[in-house]
Amino acid sequence: MLSKSLFTIAILLLWLLAFCVGAFIDSNPLRARLAQEFDIETFLLVISAWIPTNLAFLSILAGLSGALCRSFLRSVEVGIEQIRPGKERSRIIGGGVAGLLFYLSLMAGAFLLMNEPFETTTKQQYFRVAGVVSFIGFLAGFRPDLLRRILNNLPGF
């Protein structure tokens, strides 16, 4: 139980760190510099701060935190001795996968609707999209059947 608590705190701190990186680091000049000359430090900053990749991190971390919250609630409801660790671990990993699936469906929709949805990005755009992605990623991890219902309402799924 203690290790799951520490893992949950680590996931929440990583989500907060990823959100702050996406919110406070402007990736547009970094991407321009990277296009001229490659260096690993700039590359890693672009990977962590550019909206599409940052949203992937946020979505996966939100899915994991949703699954971890569900796991904590489940252990309170049925008792910790009734929970099988292997099955619980796969549910938590499934939460991260559900967050990733939502992110992939969002990206597919963004590129279907616009030619270059992330060519130039703004902080306002980031705050709007990051909030929605994180919230639905959390719900997808907390209640995986919810993701299925959301995707069923989208044409083509």
Predicted regions and their residues:
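Hydrophobic transmembrane alpha-helical segments of multi-pass transport and channel proteins
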Residues: 134, 138, 142, 146-147
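N-terminal soluble segments of membrane proteins
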Residues: 1-93, 107-133, 148-157
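Hydrophobic alpha-helical transmembrane segments in multi-pass integral membrane proteins
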Residues: 99-109
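Core segments of transmembrane alpha-helices
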Residues: 93-99
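Short, electropositive, low-hydrophobicity segments enriched in small/polar residues
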Residues: 70, 99, 145
